[in-house]
Amino acid sequence: MYISDGEEKDIVPHFTFYGYRYVKISGVTNVSCEDFTGMALYSDYEGTGSIQTGNELVNQLISNVEWGMKDNFLDVPTDCPQRDERMGWTGDTQVFSGTACYLADTYAFYRKYLYDLYKEQLIAGGMVPEVVPT
């Protein structure tokens, strides 16, 4: 939210997203953490599998994997949401797809991605590109 003409307005970016752990705000005073809201963006899918152990460290690791999947499943499977590598890398997709299919119903997500891959293969003479879509 910002105020420039006397009226409060919310800022919600519609054409970009950022992955982050910390946010630094500068140039303003009298702000607190309660003045900000983070928003998790990810493709909609239903969770289908879960694991719970008696070890809190292992449970945290599993939670990190689940949130990592959410972080990287926004229209295409990416390898990291915080840098300019927010693209559908086919190698990363191949490595994580088994885990993803265990954790969630990924049928619609991967069907769309594999259709995009098929379209790229038509252009590339049947070769699988490193990134889909290119």
Predicted regions and their residues:
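Extracellular/oxidizing-compartment recognition motifs
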Residues: 1-83, 91-92, 108-117, 123-134
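Well-ordered alpha-helical scaffold segments within catalytic/enzyme domains
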Residues: 95-106
